[in-house]
Amino acid sequence: MALSLFTVGQLIFLFWTMRITEARPDPAAKAAPAAAAVPAAAAPDTASDAAAAAALTAANAAAAAKLTADNAAAAAAATARG
């Protein structure tokens, strides 16, 4: 009996909080449609950001390849020494 009263209490609390949330919607939810209407001037920024990200990715890949080659050379030298 106590468990069922507890469950009923939880349901009442759930519906009460839902009612409060519907009465006072989140301001961020109102701002979302405004943020969706991004001006066309933001497109070049996106393109330059993408180019910068691609350059950074290429630099990271080159550094990783150099590190791998250096590690392989060091391992080969250590193996040759015995």
From Swiss-Prot:
Keyword Signal belongs to the record: yes
InterPro entries: Antifreeze_1
Domain of life: Eukaryota
Signal peptide limits: 1-23
Subcellular compartments: Secreted, Extracellular space
GO biological process entries: homoiothermy; response to freezing
Tissue specificity field: Detected in liver (at protein level).
Protein name: Ice-structuring protein B
